[in-house]
């Protein structure tokens, strides 16, 4: 009978097989996290395009539809607020995905340090965020939302009188 914490010789192959399966799972999760960022961006692009198109349709057609200018302006502002909410939601999902990626990569490094040897894989450094595509996805979302609000504030809303 083995003492708790003591490894039996026949347990080493089982342990290595378990580590290999866990490593495969971690790599699959890292791949999924990477794919999800693009799915979230596609979600943002689709919803933002639809909402901004509705705002532009409201801007172009509010007179023909006999809407009061104040009502049309409120509609444009409401649609842009929805775009902002979608952008915030998408940004949150991207940030959470990046944090998950860091966690999975650290777990990957733990496994390789134990099974292969220390330093086999270097740990990710959050200071390298300028090399992460998530950084630029977030910048794109931020710049696009700011641009939409500025275009509405300086061109659309003043023209709706």
Residue ranges and their predicted role:
Residues 3-65, 86:
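Cytosol/matrix-facing amphipathic helices and coiled-coil assembly/linker segments
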Residues 34, 120-146:
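Loop-to-transmembrane boundary segments
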Residues 36, 40, 65-122:
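Inner-leaflet juxtamembrane helices
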Residues 8-17, 21, 105-132:
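Solvent-exposed, non-transmembrane helices and loops of integral membrane proteins
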Residues 49-52, 83-94, 144-149:
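Helical transmembrane-bundle signal
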Residues 1-14, 95-105:
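Short, non-transmembrane cytosolic segments of multipass membrane proteins
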Residues 147-161:
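Juxtamembrane boundary at the C-terminal end of a transmembrane helix
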Residues 57-74, 159-161:
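Membrane-interfacial hairpin junctions
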């Amino acid at each position: 009978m083995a003492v708790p914490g003591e490894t039996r010789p026949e347990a080493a192959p089982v342990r290595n097989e378990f580590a290999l399966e866990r490593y495969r799972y971690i790599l699959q999760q890292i791949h999924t996290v990477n794919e999800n960022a693009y799915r979230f961006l596609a979600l943002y692009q689709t919803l933002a395009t639809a909402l901004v198109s509705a705002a532009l349709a409201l801007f172009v057609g509010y007179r023909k539809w006999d809407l009061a200018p104040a009502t049309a302006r409120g509609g444009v502002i409401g649609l842009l607020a929805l775009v902002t909410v979608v952008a915030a939601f998408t940004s949150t999902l991207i940030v959470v995905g990046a944090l998950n990626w860091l966690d999975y990569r650290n777990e990957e490094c733990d496994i390789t340090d134990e099974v292969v040897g220390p330093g086999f894989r270097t740990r990710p450094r959050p200071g390298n965020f300028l090399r992460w595509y998530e950084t630029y996805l977030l910048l794109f979302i931020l710049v696009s939302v700011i641009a939409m609000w500025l275009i509405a504030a300086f061109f659309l809303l003043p023209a709706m009188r």
